[in-house]
Swiss-Prot record:
This is Leukotoxin translocation ATP-binding protein LktB. It comes from Mannheimia haemolytica (Pasteurella haemolytica). InterPro entries: AAA+_ATPase, ABC1_TM_dom, ABC1_TM_sf, ABC_transporter-like_ATP-bd, ABC_transporter-like_CS, ATPase_T1SS_HlyB, P-loop_NTPase, Peptidase_C39. ATP binds at G503, R504, S505, G506, S507, G508, K509, S510. GO terms for biological process: protein secretion by the type I secretion system; proteolysis. The gene is lktB. Keywords: ATP-binding, Cell inner membrane, Cell membrane, Membrane, Nucleotide-binding, Translocase, Transmembrane, Transmembrane helix, Transport.
Length: 708
C-alpha cells in the first residue's frame, strides 16, 4: 500500500514538474481526482491520459542506455516499482547522468554504473503540443515557401522574364555563327548590317529585361525581408522573460543581426543565378545539336563542381560556426562593456578590459581568416575545373574543326553557349560561402524564432481587475535542477490592502511578484487574481492592469512625457502631470528648459538616479492600475524625494492593492499588513507594532539592526 502511495506521489510530482517546464499549470488534486480512480496512484496509462488532458504530448518508449543522448530531455524514467525519476541531461563525454530524484526532491549526478543499476529501460518523452506545432512550422528554409506562394504572381513574372533572357542569350551565339560562317566567307555586307542591327536590338532588350528582372525580384524579396524583420521583432518581444535571463544580451543581438546576412542573400545575385542555372537545359539541347562530344565534356565537368563543393562545405560550415561563436562573444563583451562603462572607469579597469577585448578580437580575426582562406581555396578549385574544361574543349574543338565535323562559327557559338551554362555554375560555386553563411544565419535566427512564446491556456481576458490576490500552496524554482525559491507559500491579499514584504536577500520576495506578473508559472499551486488562475490568463491583459516599479528602471530615449505615457501615447497631458505630481516628479520636470518634452537620453542618462526613479513611478501610476508593485522602488531615492512620495502614499494607494517590497523597514511600517519571508517561506505576518512585540522574530531582529 505504501509503495502504491509512493508511486502516486512521484508520478504526480513528475507530471507537475514537466508541465511547469512546458509553461502549463495544473491542479494536482484535480488530476488525482480524474485519473487516480482506484486511489493506488497513476498507472502508466492514466499518466499518459493525464498528460494529454494538459495539452502535453507524452509517449512511452523503451530505449537502450547507449542511445539516451539522442532523446529530447527532460524525460521521465518510468519504474515499475514506482520510484520514478527525471532524466535531465546525459554527459556522454564523462559517462554521467544528471537526474532529478523525486523522492528526495533534489538533483543528482549518477555515474554509469549507478544509472545502469536503477534504469529499467522505460522512458516517457513529453513535449507540449504548442511546441509540436512550433516544430512543424519552425523557421528554416521552408519558411520562405509560403512567402514565395504569396508573391507567386511577381515570381511568375520574374520566371517569364528569365525565359526571355535565356532565349536572347541563345540568339547571340547564333548571330556570331552566321557572321563567321556566312558573312565573312561570302563578304555579305548587307547581311552583316541586318545582323548587327538585330544584335543591337537583342542586346537592348536583354539589358532592359535584365534590369527589370532585378528590380522586380529585389522589390519582392524586400517585401519578404520586411515580413521577416517584423515577425522577428514581434516574436522577440513575445518570448518569456526566462529566455532573456538565460542568454547574454550580445548573443541575442548577434542572432538578430543575422537577418542582415539573409537580406543580402535575398537581394543579391545568388537567386538570379539559380534561375539562370535552371534554364541551362535549353542550352544543353542546342549544344548537343552542335557537338555531342563537346557537350559531354561540359556535362562531365558538372559533377566535378558538385564533388568539390561537397568536399569543401562541411569544413567551411564548421569554420563559419566557429566564426559566428567568436563574433557573438565579441558582441556580448562589447555590450557588457558599454553597459558597465561607469564601473569600468570608476575602478580603472580599462587595461584589463582592453586585454580581454584584444584576445577575443584576435581569436575572431583568426577564425575569420581561416574562413577566408578556405573560401579562396574553394574558389580557386572552381577556377581550376573551369580552366581545365576550357583547355579540353579548345583541343577537342580544334580537332573537330580540322576534321570538318564542326565549323569555326559553330565552335565559337558552342563556346559562347557553354559560357552561358558554366557562368551561373561558377557564380554559385563562388557564392557557396554565402549559401553556407545564410544557412547558418537561418539556423541562428531559428534559435530565436523557434523558441516558444509565452503560452496560456484558453485566452482568458477578463474585465478590469479589482485587486483580490491569492497565492495557494505555491512551490517554485527557476529550473528543474535549481534550488527551491518558494516553498508552500499561502497568502491572501484583500482588495485595496497595502502589503509590505520584507526579508533577507534571496528569501523569495521579488520572485513572488514575478509570479503575480505571470513571468513564470509555479511548479505547484495557483496564483489567482479575483479568483481567476493566472496560468490561464492572457499575459498582456494581466500586465496592462498592474503597475510595477523596480529598483533599477529603464527609460527609453524619448521625452519625459513619452516615457510616462508609454502605454498610451495619446494620453491627455493632464493625466501625465497628475501622475508626475503623485510621484514627486512634477517640480523638477517643470524646472527643466524643455519641461515634459525633455529628451532623457539612452536609458535616462540625462537624468539623475532619483529623477529616473520618480519618472518610473509616474509611469506606473499613470494608467491607474488596481494592483501596484513597488519592488525596492524608493531605495535609490534621496530622502527628500522619498519623503515626497511617502507623503503622497495615501493618495497613491487609494483604491488599489499595493505590494511594497523593501529592505528599509521604514518604507513598510504603515502598511496594513507586513509579510516576513525567510528561505522561501512566510515566517511572520502582522502590523508593524505587532511584529515588534515578538522579540525573537526575524522582523524584530531586522528592525533592531536598522536602528543600530
Amino acid at each position: 500500500m505504501e509503495a502504491n502511495h509512493q508511486r502516486n506521489d512521484l508520478g504526480l510530482v513528475a507530471l507537475t514538474m514537466l508541465a511547469q517546464y512546458h509553461n502549463i499549470s495544473l491542479n494536482p488534486e484535480e488530476i488525482k481526482h480524474k485519473f487516480d480512480l482506484d486511489g493506488k496512484g497513476l498507472s502508466l496509462t492514466s499518466w499518459l491520459l493525464a498528460a494529454k488532458s494538459l495539452a502535453l504530448k507524452a509517449k512511452h518508449i523503451k530505449k537502450e542506455i547507449s542511445r539516451l543522448h539522442l532523446v529530447n530531455l527532460p524525460a521521465l524514467v518510468w519504474q515499475d516499482n514506482g520510484k520514478h525519476f527525471l532524466l535531465v541531461k546525459v554527459d556522454t563525454d564523462n559517462n554521467r547522468y544528471l537526474t532529478y530524484n523525486l523522492e528526495q526532491d533534489a538533483p543528482q549526478i549518477l555515474s554509469q554504473d549507478e544509472f545502469e543499476a536503477c534504469y529499467q529501460g522505460q522512458l516517457i518523452l513529453v513535449t507540449s503540443r504548442a511546441s509540436v506545432v512550433g516544430q512543424l512550422a519552425k523557421f528554416d528554409f521552408t519558411w520562405f515557401i509560403p512567402a514565395v506562394i504569396k508573391y507567386r504572381k511577381i515570381f511568375l513574372e520574374t520566371l517569364i522574364v528569365s525565359i526571355f533572357l535565356q532565349i536572347f542569350a541563345l540568339i547571340t551565339p547564333l548571330f556570331f555563327q552566321v557572321v563567321m560562317d556566312k558573312v565573312l566567307v561570302h563578304r555579305g555586307f548587307s547581311t552583316l548590317n541586318i545582323i548587327t542591327v538585330a544584335l543591337a536590338i537583342v542586346i537592348i532588350f536583354e539589358i532592359v529585361l535584365s534590369g527589370l528582372r532585378t528590380y522586380v525580384f529585389s522589390h519582392s524579396t524586400s517585401r519578404i525581408d520586411v515580413e521577416l524583420g517584423a515577425k522577428l521583432f514581434r516574436h522577440l518581444l513575445s518570448l518569456p522573460i526566462s529566455y532573456f535571463e538565460n542568454r547574454r544580451v550580445g548573443d541575442t543581438v548577434a542572432r538578430v543581426r543575422e537577418l542582415d546576412q539573409i537580406r543580402n542573400f535575398l537581394t543579391g545575385q545568388a537567386l538570379t543565378s539559380v534561375l539562370d542555372l535552371l534554364f541551362s537545359f535549353i542550352f544543353f539541347a542546342v549544344m548537343w545539336y552542335y557537338s555531342p562530344k563537346l557537350t559531354l565534356v561540359i556535362l562531365g565537368s558538372l559533377p566535378c563542381y558538385i564533388l568539390w563543393s561537397i568536399f569543401i562545405s562541411p569544413i567551411l560550415r564548421r569554420r563559419l560556426d566557429d566564426k559566428f561563436a567568436r563574433s557573438a562573444d565579441n558582441q556580448a563583451f562589447l555590450v557588457e562593456s558599454v553597459t558597465a562603462i561607469n564601473m569600468i572607469k570608476a575602478m580603472a579597469v580599462a587595461p584589463q578590459m582592453t586585454d580581454t577585448w584584444d584576445k577575443q578580437l584576435a581569436s575572431y580575426v583568426s577564425s575569420s581568416f581561416r574562413v577566408t582562406v578556405l573560401a579562396t581555396i574553394g574558389q580557386q578549385g572552381v577556377q581550376l575545373i573551369q580552366k581545365t574544361v576550357m583547355v579540353i574543349n579548345l583541343w577537342l574543338g580544334a580537332h573537330l574543326v580540322i576534321s570538318g565535323d564542326l565549323s569555326i562559327g559553330q565552335l565559337i557559338a558552342f563556346n559562347m553557349l557553354s559560357g552561358q551554362v558554366i557562368a551561373p555554375v561558377i557564380r554559385l560555386a563562388q557564392l557557396w560561402q554565402d549559401f553556407q553563411q545564410v544557412g547558418i544565419s537561418v539556423t541562428r535566427l531559428g534559435d530565436v524564432l523557434n523558441s516558444p512564446t509565452e503560452q496560456y491556456q484558453g485566452k482568458l481576458s477578463l474585465p478590469e481587475i479589482k485587486g483580490y490576490i491569492s497565492f495557494k500552496n505555491i512551490r517554485f524554482r527557476y529550473k528543474p535542477d535549481a534550488p527551491t525559491i518558494l516553498n508552500n507559500v499561502n497568502l491572501e491579499i484583500r482588495q485595496g490592502e497595502v502589503i509590505g514584504i520584507v526579508g533577507r536577500s534571496g528569501s523569495g520576495k521579488s520572485t513572488l511578484t514575478k509570479l503575480l506578473q505571470r513571468f513564470y508559472i509555479p511548479e505547484n499551486g495557483q496564483v489567482l487574481i479575483d479568483g481567476h488562475d493566472l496560468a490561464l490568463a492572457d499575459p498582456n491583459w494581466l500586465r496592462r492592469q498592474i503597475g510595477v516599479v523596480l529598483q533599477d528602471n529603464v527609460l527609453l530615449n524619448r521625452s519625459i512625457r513619452e516615457n510616462i505615457a508609454l502605454s498610451d501615447p495619446g494620453m491627455p497631458m493632464e493625466r501625465v502631470i497628475y501622475a508626475a505630481k503623485l510621484a514627486g516628479a512634477h517640480d523638477f520636470i517643470s524646472e527643466l528648459r524643455e519641461g515634459y518634452n525633455t529628451i532623457v537620453g539612452e536609458q535616462g542618462a540625462g537624468l539623475s538616479g532619483g529623477q529616473r526613479q520618480r519618472i518610473a513611478i509616474a509611469r506606473a501610476l499613470v494608467n491607474n492600475p488596481k494592483i501596484l508593485i513597488f519592488d525596492e522602488a524608493t531605495s535609490a531615492l534621496d530622502y527628500e524625494s522619498e519623503h515626497i512620495i511617502m507623503q503622497n502614499m495615501q493618495k497613491i494607494c487609494q483604491g488599489r492593492t499595493v505590494i511594497l517590497i523593501a529592505h528599509r523597514l521604514s518604507t513598510v511600517k504603515n502598511a496594513d499588513r507586513i509579510i516576513v519571508m525567510e528561505k522561501g517561506e512566510i515566517v511572520e505576518q502582522g502590523k508593524h507594532h505587532e511584529l515588534l512585540q515578538n522579540s525573537n522574530g526575524l522582523y524584530s531582529y531586522l528592525h533592531q539592526l536598522q536602528l543600530n
